[in-house]
Amino acid sequence: MKIEKTEKKETCCDVIPAEVIKLLEEQLVNEMHNMRVYQTFAVYFNNIGLNSLYSYYKTRAYEEFHHYSNICEFLDNNLVKYNFIEIPECKIDIKNSIDPFELTVQLELDTTDAFYEIYELAEKNHDYITIQWLMKPNGLIEEQSEEMRTSYKALEIANMNLDWISKADAILKLL
């Protein structure tokens, strides 16, 4: 009797569910958008002479680029075929120096929600590769939690009844 063994050859890209890949593609766009928003805030603060807040937002922009790169690296390392979605135009109307901090909190809340949506979808699909990657020490979920704390603290300082030089220096020290 001859037994034929048929094997399903699974590539890494077959392991990451298509729905998870779609959310990761969307997150690439979100990270680049957030980076551009933070660069816009950096320029705003530079133009009004608050160099500490320029540095703060340049660093925040770099963190967003780091997330973007981390997602690309994860997809590349797992041989995932993915697409770049167009990044929407960045139009920000800054009315006062508090606006950037309020918008930062909202952007970071949205980003946190997006990462947990990816996590929950990965969990639903038994995608343990993505779950492990998101939850590893210094992984995206841990970093995102830290960014949320920093954003809330920065907004709290920005709302204090102090001069902007003092507030700017205190906010920069959060990083």
Residue spans of the language-model regions?
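Iron-associated oxidoreductase/ferritin-like identity signal
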Residues: 1-175
